[in-house]
Amino acid sequence: MRVWIDADACPKAAKDLIVKFALKRKFEVVMVAGQAVAKPAFAIVRLIVVPSGMDAADDYIVEHAVPGELVICSDVPLADRLVKKGVAALDPRGREFDERNMGDRLAARNLFTELREQGQVGGGQAAYGEREKQAFANALDRIIARLSKG
């Protein structure tokens, strides 16, 4: 069992939860980033820094993740590529990406990108608080249990 993290955009609290689960359940964590990020000092965690470039970390994850593994990412187009490949994908707020919701998630992402570019909406997501952490922990637990059963 392996969990991949799109580490550039993943909140520290979510990364910490993943490592805690990994230590308890004995699975590998691979953090992929386009720049150096803090890596927890445990042997089960690897950090891969890819050459900077548009979607370089995403491309690396898609190329190396396989069905039966989980990727933690906020990037909807990345999640779409993973789901099409049969790889489980979860955002740090506890929302799983799957074939049933991918179309809606992509449409919403594209709409908000367009509105942001037109200056009609600002900023990004709301703060990452206790509610988000709990939703993420619950979803992570559920998906890891499902993937571990094979």
From Swiss-Prot:
CDD domains: PIN_YqxD-like. Transmembrane segments: none annotated. InterPro entries: UPF0178. Belongs to the UPF0178 family. This is UPF0178 protein PP_5221. It comes from Pseudomonas putida (strain ATCC 47054 / DSM 6125 / CFBP 8728 / NCIMB 11950 / KT2440). The lineage of its organism: Bacteria, Pseudomonadati, Pseudomonadota, Gammaproteobacteria, Pseudomonadales.
